[in-house]
Regions:
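Short, acidic/polar
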Residues: 58-69, 122-136, 186-192, 279-283
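Local cysteine-cluster metal-coordination motifs and their immediate loop/turn environment
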Residues: 335-349, 383-398
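C-terminal segment of N-terminal export signals and the immediately downstream linker at the start
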Residues: 23-48, 52
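Beta/alpha (TIM)-barrel catalytic core signal, keyed to glycine-rich beta->alpha loops juxtaposed to Asp/Glu
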Residues: 150-354, 364-378, 404
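Acidic (Asp/Glu)-rich catalytic clusters
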Residues: 40-42, 92-100, 135-138, 194-197
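Active-site groove signature of glycoside hydrolases
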Residues: 135-155
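Conserved, mostly hydrophobic/aromatic
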Residues: 38, 50, 78, 104, ...
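N-terminal secretory signal peptides and thylakoid transit peptides that target proteins
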Residues: 1-16
Length: 415
């Protein structure tokens, strides 16, 4: 596989940006939204999408307000990977009045058990969870049915050769899903899936920090030691470059997650580049990858939608990420939580991603803000309940020392 230098990556990005901007039209609020074909699906998606993950911690009122703001700008694609029945209900209530205007990317294999998210390939549970998704989203079909979260080639091979993929095909044949997709963090899995011809859409984590790293082959080996970073590391990882090219060449629509790296790229102190990026710069980086169709950004309030949609009218200077990439270190994200939630389920019922989020918010301040402490104390289970079993660490795609962070959070918050 070909290896690119930073200079080549930046030059390619500049050319690609000019090409797609010249070809995109738009409507929506103030006529600013841009749209792209979603691979060969026949669907056109807004380049700014709605990753609804953060609605889980928000009220129905906020969820509806964010959804209406998205609609006002012409955002037309939403991702719902979450299995929590409460967030599914909130999202369903918000999108139901304008269901036909939304392209729903829903996940099969994301289930709810004993009050927690759990990923599974057990078909009876998957079928029950999918029926729940349809009911709570108040719809009789999902536009893009995603095979939820596969990060090893071995698991992909098992799924593609077994009853799970057959179930996905049955859903498509019945019209309950219109297209089959896959979500993964591992470019090797993405490459295998795209080459198989079995998927039409790929949801993949794309940002400048992740793109310089080698692929994940299995969670426990992610970033295991400095030997993962050789002297040649510095441009985009060749596996990722190949994946993006394959998506473009074969018409597999690339829907982007983690464009902001969980918000860490906005903070100079926490960013691996030691320089803060803006939402516009992160979005521009993602959308200049070959095959990229939409960035599924996360929002906590309507103003976050405004910040993302500003991309559509941003100047070249506002979109410029090259000056940051030119100063990028060789490696970036070893041991840093992006609040993705893949560590679940916790044997003690702790919402690990939320505890980590609140902990990071708290330690960034001279003292714990009252609002952060209030949110923490309102959680059903606290970091002090951690038993250090470390089962969560085996599921973490970023090799975070979760047990140690739980101890630190318990000490900081007092429970």
């Amino acid at each position: 596989m070909e290896k690119f230098t930073r200079r080549e990556v930046l030059a390619t990005a500049t050319l690609a940006a000019g090409a797609w901007v010249a070809g995109c039209g738009g409507n929506g609020r103030n006529g600013k939204m841009l749209y792209r074909p979603l691979g060969k699906t026949g669907l056109d998606v807004s380049v700014i999408g709605f990753g609804a993950e953060w609605m889980e911690r928000n009220t129905q009122e906020t969820c509806t307000a964010v959804t209406r703001r998205c609609e006002s700008y012409g955002i037309n694609i939403v991702d719902c990977w979450m299995s929590n029945p409460e967030v599914r209900t909130k999202l369903g209530n918000a999108i139901a009045p304008n269901r036909r205007n939304w392209i729903i990317q829903g996940h099969v294999g994301s289930t709810w058990k004993d009050g927690q998210y759990e990923r599974t390939r057990d078909l009876p549970r998957c079928k029950e969870a999918f029926a729940d998704l349809l009911a709570r989203l108040q719809t009789d079909y999902i536009d893009i049915g995603m095979i939820h979260y596969i990060d090893t080639v071995e698991e992909w091979n098992t799924v593609v050769q077994g009853p799970f993929l057959q179930y996905m095909k049955e859903l498509k044949a019945s019209g309950k899903i219109r297209h089959i997709g896959l979500s993964t963090h591992n470019p090797l899995v993405g490459i295998a899936a795209v080459k198989s011809g079995e998927i039409e859409v790929l949801m993949f984590s794309v940002n400048p920090a992740y793109d310089i790293l080698p692929p994940i082959e299995e969670f426990m080996s992610y970033y295991k030691g400095d030997e993962r970073y050789d002297a040649k590391l510095g441009g985009i990882a060749p596996e990722r470059a190949e994946l993006y090219r394959l998506c473009e060449e074969r018409g597999v629509g690339l829907t982007v997650m983690k464009a902001y790296a969980g918000g860490r790229l906005f903070d100079a102190e926490r960013s691996p580049f030691k320089t803060a990026l803006t939402p516009v710069q992160c979005i521009h980086y993602a959308l200049t990858r070959p095959g990229a169709c939409t960035v599924l950004a996360g929002y906590d309030k309507p103003e976050h939608v405004d910040a993302a949609v500003h991309y559509c009218e941003a100047s070249a200077a506002e979109r410029d990420y090259a000056s940051v990439l030119a100063k990028a270190p060789r490696h970036a994200y070893d041991g840093q939580c992006t609040y993705c939630g893949h560590c679940a389920p916790c044997t003690s019922g702790i919402d690990i991603a939320m505890v980590n989020k609140l902990y990071d918010l708290a330690v960034a301040q001279p003292s714990v803000p009252d609002s952060v402490r209030k949110h923490y104390l309102a959680l059903k289970h606290h970091a002090g309940e951690c038993t250090s079993c470390k089962r969560c660490e085996s599921r973490c795609p970023f090799h975070v020392g979760i047990a140690a962070r739980m101890q630190a959070a318990a000490k900081l918050f007092g429970c």
